[in-house]
Amino acid sequence: MSDKHINLVIVTGMSGAGKTVAIQSFEDLGYFTIDNMPPALVPKFLELIEQTNENRRVALVVDMRSRLFFKEINSTLDSIESNPSIDFRILFLDATDGELVSRYKETRRSHPLAADGRVLDGIRLERELLSPLKSMSQHVVDTTKLTPRQLRKTISDQFSEGSNQASLRIEVMSFGFKYGLPLDADLVFDVRFLPNPYYQVELREKTGLDEDVFNYVMSHPESEVFYKHLLNLIVPILPAYQKEGKSVLTVAIGCTGGQHRSVAFAHCLAESLATDWSVNESHRDQNRRKETVNRS
């Protein structure tokens, strides 16, 4: 086996306490996640992870939905603990009986251990069965008074790697207004007021990623002023988006055709933000004109 470490979080706890929100939060933090994992399959799954170069941060939901399989949880945890290449923690989500009953009434779902349909009986049985696991958990979170957003923030605070990159990803994209606004954009900026390289014959067939086009776009005084204001607007508000629990922020910059000005600006912005944040850069329409010409 590889000597590289796996960072494993076992997510467990009371049914209705927020495990679905929790596992989604781990996925947003960049973890490889699996919901409702039978305990007996965990060691074999971790062996497969060790043999690959895939994501070594893993979060698995293991709970009473496994029913009969759950009795193997102790032997599974012993196996994990004996493996020096695995660092693991247990996150236990809890809530008061009254709050859990209220949540089940609201969703109209049945409790996995309520054989006769009485939710409170199922909750009490589950609490008794999970008591030993709760006592060995490194993290116990009471979600009784927490909103989903607050739970996501709690998980981010406790399990992110301590950087902005772990909890907010920024998608910087360019586009052409003539092809429509991006439906998933959170912030949209229009750079059609800038001089257009399209009217420079030697630049027309190139894109904003080509050095001469990039320099043409960014060297104009209007570009310098606008870019400065753009950074001054975006950078201070990123922590606020992060605090609100947003995992992906899409910043879209548009020009007429999405080939020159918006591409150059998006590329420049992505490089600036990437010094402190996790950034993905994309250019939706930069080749759209060429593809249209080739099809005609």
From Swiss-Prot:
InterPro entries: P-loop_NTPase, RapZ-like, RapZ-like_N, RapZ_C. GTP binds at residues 63-66. Pfam families: PapZ_C, RapZ-like_N. ATP binds at residues 13-20. Signal peptide: none annotated. The keyword Electron transport does not apply. Keywords: ATP-binding, GTP-binding, Nucleotide-binding. One of its GO terms (molecular function) is ATP binding. Belongs to the RapZ-like family. Displays ATPase and GTPase activities. This is Nucleotide-binding protein M6_Spy0559.
